Amino acid sequence: MIITLARVDDRLIHGQVTTVWSKESNADRIIIVSSEVYKDDIRKTLLKQAAPPGMKVNIVDVPKAIAVYNNPKYQNEKVFYLFTNPREVVDLVKGGIPLEKLNIGGMQFKQGKTQISKAVSLDADDVAAFRELHQLGVKLDLRVVKTDPSSDILAKIDEVFGKE
């Protein structure tokens, strides 16, 4: 499997993803990795309907994503991974999927989260997950839209939450 793009964006498939990021990725398929969405049949149906024309969409949990990645049937498939949170990205990488770079696009503000940029709000688990991804060698790219300059999420985390 060829990973062309991996992105954390809790809105998953929306305007920016369908018009810009999916084209930028040049992928054959979007794989949404989310145990929460995987269990929600209505949300799965809506996300598949929102996909760009001609783009295949699969919604899986982490164990299924790892199994599919390791299936020789998909070795030449170009995929765009979408996640709702960084913890599942950590689980994927620890499960043996080599992820070089992760784009962080949008993580909405909710109670218990702290806003670190115009579109990204984090809680302690998110912070720990991003720090762990960095330690695992994943390059972190904070950019909501393609034309935004890349921003150092770890510097923002240290500024807002303090250094580790």
Curated annotation (Swiss-Prot):
Keywords: Cytoplasm, Kinase, Phosphoprotein, Phosphotransferase system, Sugar transport, Transferase, Transport
Predominant location: cytoplasm
Gene Ontology MF terms in the entry: kinase activity; protein-N(PI)-phosphohistidine-sorbose phosphotransferase system transporter activity
Residue positions, PTM Phosphohistidine: 14
Free-text comment about domains: The PTS EIIB type-4 domain is phosphorylated by phospho-EIIA on a histidyl residue. Then, it transfers the phosphoryl group to the sugar substrate concomitantly with the sugar uptake processed by the PTS EIIC type-4 domain.
NCBIfam families xrefs: pts-sorbose
Function: The phosphoenolpyruvate-dependent sugar phosphotransferase system (PTS), a major carbohydrate active transport system, catalyzes the phosphorylation of incoming sugar substrates concomitant with their translocation across the cell membrane. The enzyme II SorABCD PTS system is involved in L-sorbose transport.
The protein, known as: PTS system sorbose-specific EIIB component
Source organism: Lacticaseibacillus casei
